[in-house]
């Protein structure tokens, strides 16, 4: 019990997670599960990369202390050390917090997770309703910088909202049980030789081996963005990477979504023919690649041959880890295949454009809420006509133009009297007051512009709608 039941209806607000109390300024060990969400939020708001380490103070340390104090040899006692701390999977925690937070907290969580180089939710599952939601609004706050090859010589860079960036999406999914750790392999694939980072939670991380209860069906996304250094860049072009948690046989909607939005889908498998029937029924807009472990007991070369024939796959679409291949070689081979898939594909998509695919498949989009749409409509009414910024300000904000500039100059002169010369001071000030009065009359002669009318209407709307408007 994470103590979040009260927030299923009344969501966690931004003001709540920004509250300061004694626990905020101290770093005490976790003693119960109800402390975990707030501990995670505190660490995440500080952009602490250890935020996902949410292990409780367990009995394991006590048992080890007791064992170290005794002089007797008792190997069975060492084997039976309980592991009570690793009972909550970080993915369950993240899923629970996103489900229990309002849109503005979700946006802040996604931004801070991205800053920590964590993957962020793309499709959020809800085990109560058995539906998933495209987290478009939550990702809108993420802005990324990168340097494509075209700008490497000039040392320039591109900066844009990640939801608007049209990038090739490469998805990784699992069919049936698999001895290969898909997420750990992905982390190695995205890390260069000089620096390893756990972008995705995996089995060998702290608490990563705890059973998932509510996060199966979660599709996470991260982005690989080049820095322009050929010696460090893994991919020369920016690419989005999606990772679906759980067996695609149980989450066909999420799998269909990824098949229709991705440039390539890599399917990790080891099971027999029965599981592959799902692949035959998909409407593919992406290349399919099969990734398997030859050393697995359930691997069958004959089954793979039949499936590859049915899907019209060639050797380039199949990556196998054999007994002569270690993890480093396997990751290198997989990385080369991903790189080729990115280079040979022109199928690019933005997260914004994924919304239309989501609607076709019955996937919810959190931006479809009435308050968000109203706030977005009001914001678009103000920004839609902006082409030439200076001309726009002159037409729509005339009180901030030349008249305002002249007024400020007159007010400064009224107090400083730098240009009074030999004139009578009182007469000079009176003249300045007359000039100010004339300028005020000019200001008052302007009718309220349409943009200001829209702004006043939007800022006077209901609280949630106004917040969406200001955040747009």
Give names to the regions the model predicted.
Residues 1-472:
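Conserved GTPase G-domain substructure that encodes guanine base recognition and part of the catalytic core
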């Amino acid at each position: 019990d994470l103590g979040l039941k009260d927030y299923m209806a009344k969501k966690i607000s931004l003001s709540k997670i920004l509250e300061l109390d004694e626990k905020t300024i101290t770093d005490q060990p976790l003693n119960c599960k109800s402390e975990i969400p707030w501990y995670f939020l505190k660490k995440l708001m500080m952009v602490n990369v250890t935020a996902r380490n949410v292990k409780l103070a367990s009995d394991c340390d006590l048992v080890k202390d007791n064992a170290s104090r005794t002089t007797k040899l008792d190997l069975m006692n060492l084997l039976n050390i309980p592991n009570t701390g690793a009972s909550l999977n970080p993915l369950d925690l993240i899923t629970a917090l996103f489900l229990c937070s309002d849109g503005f907290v979700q946006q802040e969580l996604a931004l801070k997770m991205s800053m920590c180089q964590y993957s962020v939710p793309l499709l959020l599952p809800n085990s109560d309703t058995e539906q998933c939601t495209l987290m478009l609004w939550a990702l809108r706050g993420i802005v990324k910088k990168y340097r494509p090859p075209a700008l490497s010589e000039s040392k320039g860079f591109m900066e844009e909202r990640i939801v608007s960036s049209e990038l090739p999406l490469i998805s990784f999914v699992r069919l049936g049980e698999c001895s290969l750790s898909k997420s750990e392999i992905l982390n190695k694939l995205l890390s260069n030789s000089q620096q390893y980072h756990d972008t995705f939670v995996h089995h060998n991380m702290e608490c990563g081996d705890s059973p998932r209860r509510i996060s199966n069906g979660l599709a996470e996304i991260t982005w690989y963005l080049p820095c322009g250094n050929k010696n460090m860049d893994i991919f020369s072009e920016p690419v989005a990477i999606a990772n679906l948690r759980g067996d695609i046989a149980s989450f066909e909607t999420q799998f269909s979504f990824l098949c229709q939005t991705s440039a390539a889908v890599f399917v990790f498998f080891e099971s027999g023919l029965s599981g592959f029937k799902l692949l035959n029924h998909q409407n593919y807009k992406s290349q399919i690649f099969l990734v398997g472990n030859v050393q697995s007991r359930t691997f069958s070369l004959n089954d793979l041959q039949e499936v590859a024939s049915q899907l019209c796959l060639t050797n380039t679409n199949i990556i196998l880890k054999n007994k002569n291949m270690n993890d480093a070689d396997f990751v290198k081979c997989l990385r080369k295949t991903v790189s080729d898939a990115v280079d040979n594909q022109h199928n690019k998509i933005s997260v914004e454009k994924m919304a239309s695919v989501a609607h076709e498949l019955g996937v919810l989009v959190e931006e479809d809420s009435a308050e968000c749409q109203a706030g977005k409509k009001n914001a678009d009414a103000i920004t839609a006509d902006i082409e030439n910024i200076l001309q726009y300000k002159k037409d729509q904000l005339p009180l901030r133009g030349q008249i305002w500039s002249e007024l400020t100059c007159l007010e400064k002169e009224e107090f400083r009297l730098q240009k009074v010369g030999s004139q009578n001071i009182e007469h000079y000030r009176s003249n300045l007051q007359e000039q100010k009065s004339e300028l005020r009359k000019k200001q008052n002669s302007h009718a309220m512009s349409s943009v200001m009318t829209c702004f006043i209407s939007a800022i006077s709307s209901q609280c949630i709608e106004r917040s969406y408007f200001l955040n747009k």
